[in-house]
Amino acid sequence: MIALIQRVKQAKVDVDGQTIGAIDKGLLVLLGVEREDDQAKMEKLATKVMSYRIFSDEDGKMNLNLKQVGGSLLVVSQFTLAADTGRGLRPSFSGAGTPEQAKQLYQAFVDYCAAQGVPVQTGEFAADMQVSLVNDGPVTFNLQV
């Protein structure tokens, strides 16, 4: 399971010209599911995302996590993160989870984070989405479990 996380000042996701999810300070999470992923991997990744210390403390050091700064999550499904780009000029998605598996784990990720008290907004699974953000830093990390 892969999460590309970006520290943002604000982010939103639109579908068909309508904003369906928006946050101010927090993390934009692009979430990719791979074939071997399961509930345990999802929980491990969700915990890591929420606990990852990428917000600055009073000394300017990355020492605070999402909950410590009162931030929110915008979680967007992104199957292309599971692409194999090692050969050729066209990505292969053979390692990506099935749509059913990905949808279930995506929703479980959202629910798990919300249950931990983190405000969560989402995109629409498998929709054509337009994501806008103001990246803070920029600070971007690729987390994988």
Curated annotation (Swiss-Prot):
Source domain of life: Bacteria
EC number of the protein: 3.1.1.96
Example GO BP: D-amino acid catabolic process
InterPro entries: Daa-tRNA_deacyls_DTD, DTD-like_sf
Keyword match Transferase: no
GO cellular component: cytoplasm
GO MF, one annotated term: Ser(Gly)-tRNA(Ala) hydrolase activity
Keyword vocabulary terms for this entry: Cytoplasm, Hydrolase, RNA-binding, tRNA-binding
Enzyme class per UniProt: hydrolase
Motif (Gly-cisPro motif, important for rejection of L-amino acids): 137-138
Catalytic activity: glycyl-tRNA(Ala) + H2O = tRNA(Ala) + glycine + H(+); a D-aminoacyl-tRNA + H2O = a tRNA + a D-alpha-amino acid + H(+)
Pfam families: Tyr_Deacylase (PF02580)
Location in or out of the cell: Cytoplasm
Function per UniProt: An aminoacyl-tRNA editing enzyme that deacylates mischarged D-aminoacyl-tRNAs. Also deacylates mischarged glycyl-tRNA(Ala), protecting cells against glycine mischarging by AlaRS. Acts via tRNA-based rather than protein-based catalysis; rejects L-amino acids rather than detecting D-amino acids in the active site. By recycling D-aminoacyl-tRNA to D-amino acids and free tRNA molecules, this enzyme counteracts the toxicity associated with the formation of D-aminoacyl-tRNA entities in vivo and helps enforce protein L-homochirality.
Quaternary structure and partners: Homodimer.
Swiss-Prot/TrEMBL domain comment: A Gly-cisPro motif from one monomer fits into the active site of the other monomer to allow specific chiral rejection of L-amino acids.
Protein family: Belongs to the DTD family.
Name the UniProt record assigns to this protein: D-aminoacyl-tRNA deacylase
